Regions:
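Structural register within alpha-helical repeat arrays
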Residues: 42, 76, 114, 148, ...
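Residue at a conserved register position within TPR or TPR-like alpha-solenoid repeats
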Residues: 46, 80, 118, 152, ...
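Short coil turns that delineate tetratricopeptide repeat
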Residues: 67, 101, 105, 139, ...
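Long, contiguous interaction/recruitment modules in multidomain scaffold/adaptor proteins
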Residues: 1-34, 129-146, 150, 154-173, ...
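TPR alpha-solenoid repeat register
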Residues: 72, 106, 110, 144, ...
Length: 399
């Protein structure tokens, strides 16, 4: 039997043994002790013979539920759920709820745990039913509302998310304005998918009303403007987003440059890029600026700019573009080396993880507004300059 099972069930076995012994002591009866011991040792025998489910049944049957033992039940069920043994957690919590000796508070606690078991199993309907029962009875209201929000997020029921999180704000005294703004953005995306830009605009304006700094809403409004050929309006919104949240500049820079170019304002785009390169290094603006320099002044000038730039602000994309420009220059007898370097850099770039959740550490190659791992909103950011430095060191080691 795996050692983990022994470790998991030892607390229950110990509690059962203690309970049996204390019961015998209270009755001061050797006969009672003899009657308890065979059942207890039967449970241990199941445990040692790789039959953990039977062991659980025996120990739970022995262990009457009272103020001294309910925490043992709850702790064991919680432990099973955290380990992914959800069916066993469900059995333990259902066993608790079926006991008539439970107080109202104890039953509510067990119901909350069972609801979380169902959530872990993906049985959201069952979990929601239990949580709504607790909510109606005004029991564990704050954790109940938190779990309901998680369920509605999984089901993408954004209207229910909004109503529930507003109730959570009232009950907990907290504010979740950023989260609400994302719910409105999700509703706007649904409206856009249905071809209703006007409804989408309404949702996005509501997102900005509840959280003024919602760069996602600003970006989506700009995209609607672009779709409706209102490019100047879109540019104003995108420049505002870049100013408010420069960390998201890589997500919007291409649209900014495209609008400037479509308007024929090359002076404006160059001024914007030069300003961003100075203020916010390694956000991708250096690549666009290098391309404009190349178009206006040639490969040599673009190469000089990028060489000086990455000497101060190392970045993998900048290094790759520099090598590509070097490959276009007149041959210096090292073409083979340059092409090999470029191939290695592209391989490393394709393997690189660009984004990471600042809360739970989840890694991704693209931006997620909600972390797929911890479900937090706006916590996934691009990797830092320190990690870019580490990538440069990796390149040197490989080559």
């Amino acid at each position: 039997m795996q050692i983990e099972w022994l470790i998991l069930l030892l607390p229950l076995a110990a509690a059962s043994g203690w309970y049996a012994a204390s019961r015998a002591a209270r009755k001061e009866s050797a006969k009672s002790e003899r009657e308890a011991n065979p059942v207890y040792f039967q449970g241990l025998n199941y445990l040692l013979n790789e039959e953990p489910d039977k062991a659980i049944d025996v120990f739970l049957e022995m262990l009457e539920v009272d103020a001294d033992t309910i925490e043992t039940h709850l702790a064991l069920g919680n432990l099973f759920r955290r380990r992914g043994e959800v069916e066993r957690a469900i059995r333990i919590h259902q066993n608790l709820i079926a006991r008539p000796a439970l107080s109202r508070e104890q039953r509510a606690q067990a119901v909350l745990e069972l609801a979380q078991d169902y959530m872990r199993s993906g049985l959201y309907d069952r979990a929601e039913q239990l949580l709504l029962e607790l909510k109606q009875g005004r029991q564990y209201v704050v954790p109940v509302l938190r779990n309901l929000v998680k369920i509605y997020q999984q089901e993408k029921d954004w209207d229910a998310c909004l109503k529930t999180i507003e109730a959570l704000d009232i009950e907990s005294g907290e504010t979740h304005d950023l989260q609400k703004s994302h719910y409105f953005c999700e509703m706007a995306n649904k409206a856009r998918a249905d071809g209703d830009n006007e409804v989408a605009r309404i949702y996005l304006k509501r997102a900005l009303n509840v959280y003024k700094g919602c760069v996602r809403a600003t970006h989506l409004l700009a995209r609607i403007d672009i779709q409706e050929n209102k490019r100047k309006d879109a540019l104003v919104k995108l420049l505002d987003a870049a100013e408010r949240a420069p960390e998201y500049l890589p997500e919007i820079i291409r649209e900014i440059v495209d609008i400037y170019r479509s308007e024929g304002d090359m002076r404006g785009v160059r001024t914007f890029l030069e300003d961003q390169v100075k203020r916010h290094p390694n956000q991708g603006t250096e690549l666009f600026l290098a391309e404009i320099i190349r178009q206006q002044s040639g490969d040599a000038e673009a190469t000089r700019f990028l060489g000086e730039y990455i000497a101060k602000n190392p970045s993998m994309p900048g290094l790759i573009r520099l090598v590509e420009l070097q490959c276009t220059m007149p041959s210096m007898g090292n073409d083979h080396l340059l092409y090999n370097v470029r191939a290695h850099l592209h391989r490393l770039m394709s393997e690189r993880i660009n984004y990471q959740c600042q809360k739970g550490g989840f890694e991704a190659k693209q931006l997620h507004w909600q972390c797929p791992s911890c479900d937090s909103w706006s916590t996934i950011k691009r990797r830092s300059l320190i990690e870019a430095d580490n990538q440069i060191k990796t390149v040197k080691e490989v080559l």
